[in-house]
Design a protein with these regions (language model features):
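Conserved short histidine dyad/triad with adjacent acidic residue
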Residues: 37-39, 50-66, 100
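Short acidic-glycine-tyrosine-enriched beta hairpin
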Residues: 85-100
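A short, N-terminal "cap"/entry segment at the start of jelly-roll beta-barrel domains
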Residues: 1-46
């Protein structure tokens, strides 16, 4: 396979992304998910790599991962997460990861909360 063919297979254009809008895990509001890499593209190492945009007052509902874990990287905005039973503020540059624990994330700021999320298989 040529180098050119390899490079083409590594790029996914914005108009090729799957975009899903709606509530997540029983949370509040309409959340936008851009599925950056999904399914077979992840070679069964992870379930999804996505960019989420959570409007002011919206949230991803309380949920737990038992056969995988979830990592968030906050790009912009402010939020609240459940961390070992305690509600903690997060913002741009923070990393949140949840393994075998219940968690949620809520936009607590005055602008969209935008973050990258990956669900990794154990």
């Amino acid at each position: 396979m040529s180098m050119k063919a390899l490079l083409i297979n590594m790029i996914k254009r914005k108009d090729e992304l799957t975009k899903v809008v709606g509530p997540i895990e029983g949370g509040k509001g309409e959340i936008s998910r851009e599925l950056l890499i999904e399914g077979d593209e992840l070679k069964n190492k992870a379930k999804v790599f996505a960019k989420l945009t959570v409007p002011v007052g919206a949230s991803v509902g309380l949920h737990e991962h038992t056969d995988d874990y979830e990592v968030y990287y906050i790009l912009s905005g402010k939020g609240k997460v459940l961390d070992n039973g305690e509600v903690v503020e997060v913002g741009a540059g923070d990393v949140v990861y949840a393994i075998d624990t219940e968690h949620y994330i809520e936009n607590s700021g005055d602008e969209d909360l935008v973050f990258l999320a990956v669900i990794v298989n154990l």
